[in-house]
Regions:
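Membrane-interface helix caps and helix-loop-helix hairpins in membrane proteins
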Residues: 185-193
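Membrane-helix interface linkers and caps
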Residues: 2-15, 43-100, 123, 216
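Hydrophobic alpha-helical segments embedded in the membrane of multi-pass proteins
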Residues: 134-141, 174-179, 195-211
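Hydrophobic alpha-helical transmembrane segments
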Residues: 23, 27, 59, 97-101, ...
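Membrane-interface helix/loop boundary segments of multi-pass membrane proteins
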Residues: 150-176, 210-213
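Alpha-helical transmembrane segments of multi-pass membrane proteins
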Residues: 32-43
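Conserved small/polar residues in nucleotide/adenosyl-binding loops
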Residues: 243-244
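Juxtamembrane helix-loop-helix connectors linking adjacent transmembrane helices
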Residues: 45, 49, 84-150, 160-161, ...
C-alpha cells in the first residue's frame, strides 16, 4: 500500500515527523478545546446569558464542539508544525461536488429508513418525522455542520492520523481512534448498545475517510445523521436515536 498522499499517513509523512508530535497535537487539542469552551462560557455569562436551559444551552453545546476547529488548527500548525490542509484531505482529494451529493443521499436514506421504522414499527405519525424542527433550523443547520466538521477534524484528522503514525497500520489506527470518539459522547454510556453504536459510527466515518482520502464525505454523512436526529420526533428507542454531535 502506497503511503504517498494517503490521508491516514498524513502526519507520519511529514518531513519533520517525530513520534512525540502527534501526541503533542492531541494534548494541545484537548487543552485548547477545554480552554476555548471555558472562555465561551465565561463570555456568555458575563453577557448575562443563562446557558443552563433553552436555546442558549443548545447553542452553547454546539459551541463547545465547534471550538475544536480552532483547537485543531492551532495544534496542527504551531505544535505539529505541518500544513493544516493535512487534516482535511490527502492527495488526490475529493471533487468539490461529492460531499454535497453524499449529504443529500445520506439524508434521504436515513430519513426514509428511520421514518419507516418509526411510523410502522412504533406507531409514530408522518408529521413527527420533522416534529422537532424549529424556526431557528437554518441557524441550527449551520451549527450542526460546523460541529460535524469539528469532530471529523479532531478524531479523523488528529487522533486517527496519530494512531496510524504510531502503529503504521490503518486498521489498528482506526480501531484505536474509535475509543476517544466514544469517550467524548456521554450518550453512549447508558448501555452496551450505545457503545456499539458510537463505535460503529467511528468506523463508518473512518471508512468514508479511507474511500475518499479525506474527511469531507465523512463530514457530510455525519451532518446528515445529526440533522435527522435533531429534527425528528418519532419516539424511537434511545438505541435507534443516538447521534453523534
Amino acid at each position: 500500500m502506497s503511503r504517498t498522499g494517503n490521508f491516514f499517513f498524513a502526519s507520519r509523512n511529514q518531513p519533520n515527523y517525530a513520534w512525540w508530535r502527534p501526541l503533542a497535537e492531541i494534548l494541545a487539542v484537548v487543552v485548547l478545546a477545554v480552554l476555548f469552551t471555558g472562555v465561551l462560557g465565561l463570555t456568555l455569562e458575563a453577557a448575562g446569558v443563562d446557558t443552563s436551559s433553552g436555546a442558549a444551552d443548545k447553542y452553547f453545546g454546539y459551541g463547545s464542539v465547534i471550538v475544536e476547529i480552532l483547537a485543531v488548527l492551532v495544534a496542527v500548525r504551531f505544535i505539529g508544525r505541518r500544513p493544516v490542509s493535512s487534516v482535511f484531505t490527502g492527495q488526490p482529494g475529493t471533487k468539490p461536488w461529492v460531499p454535497f451529493a453524499a449529504f443529500a443521499v445520506a439524508l434521504v436514506v436515513i430519513s426514509v429508513v428511520m421514518s419507516l421504522v418509526g411510523v410502522y414499527g412504533y406507531g409514530a405519525s408522518w408529521g413527527q418525522v420533522v416534529g422537532n424542527i424549529g424556526a431557528d433550523f437554518p441557524v441550527e443547520l449551520v451549527a450542526l455542520a460546523l460541529a460535524a466538521l469539528a469532530e471529523e477534524m479532531a478524531f479523523r484528522g488528529v487522533f486517527l492520523q496519530a494512531f496510524t503514525a504510531w502503529t503504521r497500520n490503518p486498521v489498528i489506527g482506526a480501531l484505536l481512534a474509535a475509543v476517544p470518539f466514544i469517550l467524548v459522547h456521554p450518550q453512549a454510556y447508558g448501555s452496551p448498545v450505545g457503545i456499539v453504536h458510537y463505535f460503529a459510527d467511528a468506523l463508518l466515518f473512518t471508512l468514508l475517510v479511507w474511500v475518499f482520502n479525506g474527511i469531507w464525505v465523512a463530514v457530510a454523512v455525519h451532518l446528515a445523521w445529526n440533522t435527522f436526529g435533531t429534527v425528528q420526533d418519532l419516539g424511537l428507542p434511545v438505541s435507534c436515536l443516538l447521534y453523534t454531535s
